[in-house]
Amino acid sequence: MSKITNEQVKHVAHLARLEITEEEATKFSAQLEAILNFADQLEEVDTEGVEPTFHVLDLQNVLREDVAETSLTQEEILKNAAHTEDGQFKVPSILGGGE
């Protein structure tokens, strides 16, 4: 496994629109490398003859019944919002430049 560089960590952080320090990049680089090394170890485990497991527990579709309930009106929801426009929340752009 090749080493995860600080530059790679910074690039991923940039794509996620996260600002990280050089110290954090170094820390995350080491953590990511440890995770990938562990994944490599898992790949080496002999699973010949082991049945695939799709569900650890023998439960399927354990969901609550979908029941419609009364909820807040649009006015009630928007009344505490700092900014609204055309009946919707208006928030600052985080992507910038139309990205």
UniProtKB/Swiss-Prot annotation:
Entry-linked SUPFAM superfamilies: Glu-tRNAGln amidotransferase C subunit
Keyword Nucleotide-binding annotated: yes
Leading EC class: ligase
Function comment: Allows the formation of correctly charged Asn-tRNA(Asn) or Gln-tRNA(Gln) through the transamidation of misacylated Asp-tRNA(Asn) or Glu-tRNA(Gln) in organisms which lack either or both of asparaginyl-tRNA or glutaminyl-tRNA synthetases. The reaction takes place in the presence of glutamine and ATP through an activated phospho-Asp-tRNA(Asn) or phospho-Glu-tRNA(Gln).
GO term, biological process aspect, one: regulation of translational fidelity
PANTHER family xref list: GLUTAMYL-TRNA(GLN) AMIDOTRANSFERASE SUBUNIT C, MITOCHONDRIAL
Example GO molecular function: ATP binding
Record's catalysed reaction(s): L-glutamyl-tRNA(Gln) + L-glutamine + ATP + H2O = L-glutaminyl-tRNA(Gln) + L-glutamate + ADP + phosphate + H(+); L-aspartyl-tRNA(Asn) + L-glutamine + ATP + H2O = L-asparaginyl-tRNA(Asn) + L-glutamate + ADP + phosphate + 2 H(+)
Recorded family membership: Belongs to the GatC family.
Keyword ATP-binding: yes
EC number: 6.3.5.-
Protein keywords: ATP-binding, Ligase, Nucleotide-binding, Protein biosynthesis
Species of provenance: Macrococcus caseolyticus (strain JCSC5402)
Protein encoded by which gene: gatC
Subunit structure, interactors included: Heterotrimer of A, B and C subunits.
One Pfam short name: GatC
Protein name as annotated: Aspartyl/glutamyl-tRNA(Asn/Gln) amidotransferase subunit C
Disulfide linkage: none
